[in-house]
């Protein structure tokens, strides 16, 4: 069962387009409210699974104290509408299956769903409406889906069709960020673990066979032994969003940087102090000029940590901020300005 947030007002934990999954065995994947509403959603999801209906909408309003359940003590001051959509073997697990395939192949994709009937379509950069349920609103859904594919994001809107006025929810799927770790030493393990927890696709490479042990890393990570000179042949660097060079070997790090300098990887992190960065830059010569605008060294945010886990957190946090076009500033400063001391 898929649960999509299709609309919000006021303050909510997540916004329109967020997705959570429920299984017939009462397993949950993801969060929509931070834990406040998931139990009720699960109850309704299981009822829907046992019924002949394809979808249902639940609304949760915590904006006032009149509501005896959702308005008592939550303090969120927001309204959330959630579309529950039956996704099972009978539907081929659509539309999620097509969105997942597109994400894995790094194609842009979107889906449009009729909120009342559960009819849907999926469009990708390679096709329009390839995965679609039968229904009288197919043409309207394809139009909305194509628009969402072009614009991105998520939206719910009313649309006039040949069969009346319909509420259509549409959302564009985003591919998982891809992270390349050049160096599979012990300190790469927490970096891979944090990134995997965020849902990133992680590849770890090393030129030393003794370090190439997939058992040390999360199950879905790729761990590959490489000849640094042919790294670009082993790994499709065009599909890498961020790379971190962390082999702890000066010559090897320089060779990794030389390969990445020829690539278009937008974020290249380098572990180690500034003096080491400058020495490597000098050895790179003219290649350093192309790398400089993309080089984050020393890698990571200044969080004050010294343990491998704290350093890994600072690295992944900086990459997360970079991928979202943020600077990694505190929310208190972003939303309220600097706080004056009392």
Task: Identify the function of each model-found stretch.
Residues 1-207, 211, 215-220, 224, ...:
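Segments forming oxygen-rich coordination pockets for charged ligands
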Residues 34, 184, 249-250, 273, ...:
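Short beta->alpha junction loops/turns
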Residues 199, 220, 264-265, 291-292:
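A generic structural signal for alpha->beta connector loops
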Residues 203-206, 242-243, 247-254, 258-283:
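ADP-ribose/adenylate-binding Rossmann-like module
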Residues 226-231, 251:
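Conserved SAM/SAH-binding loop
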Residues 229-239:
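Short amphipathic alpha-helix with an adjacent loop that forms part of the alpha/beta core around
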Residues 266, 270-342:
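Adenosine-phosphate binding glycine-rich loop
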């Amino acid at each position: 069962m898929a649960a999509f947030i299709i609309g919000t007002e006021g303050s909510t934990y997540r916004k329109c387009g967020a997705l959570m999954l429920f299984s017939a065995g009462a397993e949950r994947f993801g969060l929509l409210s931070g834990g406040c509403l998931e139990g009720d959603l699960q109850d309704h999801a299981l009822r829907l699974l046992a019924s002949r209906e394809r979808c249902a909408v639940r609304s949760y309003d915590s904006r006032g104290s009149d509501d005896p359940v959702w308005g008592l003590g939550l303090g969120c001051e927001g309204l959330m509408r959630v579309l529950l959509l039956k996704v099972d073997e009978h539907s081929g697990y659509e539309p999620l299956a097509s969105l997942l395939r597109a994400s894995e192949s790094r194609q842009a994709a979107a889906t449009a769903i009729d909120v009342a009937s559960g009819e849907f379509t999926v469009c990708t950069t390679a096709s329009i409406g390839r995965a679609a349920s039968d229904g009288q609103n197919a043409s309207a859904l394809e139009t909305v889906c194509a628009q969402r594919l072009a614009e991105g994001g998520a939206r719910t809107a009313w649309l006039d069709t040949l069969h009346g006025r319909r509420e259509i929810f549409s959302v564009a799927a985003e591919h998982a960020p891809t992270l390349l770790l050049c160096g599979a030493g012990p300190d790469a393990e927490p970096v891979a673990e944090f990134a995997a927890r965020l849902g990133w696709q992680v590849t770890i490479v090393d030129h030393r066979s003794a370090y190439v042990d997939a058992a040390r890393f999360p199950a879905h990570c790729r761990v590959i032994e490489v000849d640094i000179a042919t790294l670009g042949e082993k790994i499709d660097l065009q599909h890498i969003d961020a790379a971190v060079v962390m082999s702890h070997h000066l010559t090897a790090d320089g060779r990794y940087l030389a390969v990445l300098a020829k690539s278009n990887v937008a974020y290249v992190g380098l572990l180690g102090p500034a003096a080491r960065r400058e020495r490597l830059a000098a050895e790179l010569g003219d290649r350093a000029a192309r790398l400089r605008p993309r080089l984050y060294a020393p890698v990571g945010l200044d969080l004050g940590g010294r343990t491998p886990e704290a350093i890994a957190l600072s690295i992944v946090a900086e990459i997360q901020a970079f991928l979202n076009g943020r600077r990694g500033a505190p929310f208190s400063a972003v939303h309220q300005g600097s706080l004056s001391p009392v």
